[in-house]
C-alpha cells in the first residue's frame, strides 16, 4: 500500500492497511479466489497514490489520485483507506472496489461489460462496509432499453436514427471513449445491475448460496471461457455459465436483459476494437441449452435492493430514486403470494396500479407477449410501445402472473 505520507498524518497507518486487506479479502471471496490464497499467487495486489494520474487498474496494482477531489484526476479518492476517512463518502469506497474489480472480473467479463461487470465488486465492497447503498440504473430504464424500441444488451445506449431506428455507425476511437454518453461503448450504469440482481437473489437472501462463486469457478474452466475475440459468443456463453451454476433455466432473466435479440455485426470500441455479432442460430442454441434445466428461475429480473423514494440522493442505504415500489428482495425472500385483487387505471399512456404491493412487478401483455414491465405503482409507457389491447398482470415472486382488474 504505497501512499504519500500526507495521507497518513491524521490517522496513522494501521487502520488503512487493515481496510486495504479487507477490500482484497472481500473481492477474492466473491470471486472464489480465496481458496487459492495460501499459494501466494493472488496476493500481489498493490495500491499506488499519485498526484498526477487519475484512477486506473493495471498489472496487479491500482492507482488512486491524491489531488483535489473537485478535479477530474482527484475525483472522490483522496483518502488513506482509514475507515474514519474513507467511509465519509461512498466514492471513497466505490472507487477502490471498482479498480480492484478489474483485477478479479475476468471470468465474467467480455467487451461491453468491462466497466460494469467489475461493479459487482464495487457494490459488494459497499455492502460489506454497510453504510451506503448499491448503484445502477432503474428497472424502468431497463424496460425502455428492452422495448422502446427493442434493443440488444450490447447496444443499450448506442445512438439510432430517429426515423429508421437503425443504429448510427459509431466512430468512437481509443481517444474518444466517452462519445454519445457511453464509456468504452457500454451502458455501465445499467449493465452493472444484471450481476447485482444475481448476487441479491442467490447470495444476499440465500436462495442458492455460492452460486456466484460457482459462476467464477466455472468461468475459469475451458467449458465456460469467454472468447475475448468474439464478444457476441461470450455474451451467450455467460448466460450458459449462470444457468449451469444456478442449475436453473435462466431464459426469462436473460431475455429481459436483451441477450436474445440478434445483433447485426458492428464494431465495438472497448479497450480495443471488436466485431460484435449475435445470430439467431447462436440464440437458438443457447435457448436449447437452457432447456436442460427443468427448474425455471423466478422473475429475478425484477429483484431490487433499493426501495423507491423521490429525491433520495447519494446512494443511500436501501432507498433510491432508481428503486422500485415493488420487487424489493424481501418479497422474493419470503415468497410472498398475491392475495389481494390488483387493479389499475389508464390515462393516456400513464398507468396507476392499486393494491399491488404484494407483487414484484407489473407487466403489460399483448397477444401473449410481454411488451413492457414496471416496478412502480405509477408509470408511463413510451409512444414507441403499442399498448392498444394490452392487459396488465401482476407478477408474483414465484413467477405466477395474475391478471389485474381494470
What is the meaning of each model-derived region?
Residues 231-377, 382-394, 399-400, 404:
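Beta/coil-rich, acidic/histidine-enriched accessory regions frequently appended to metallopeptidases
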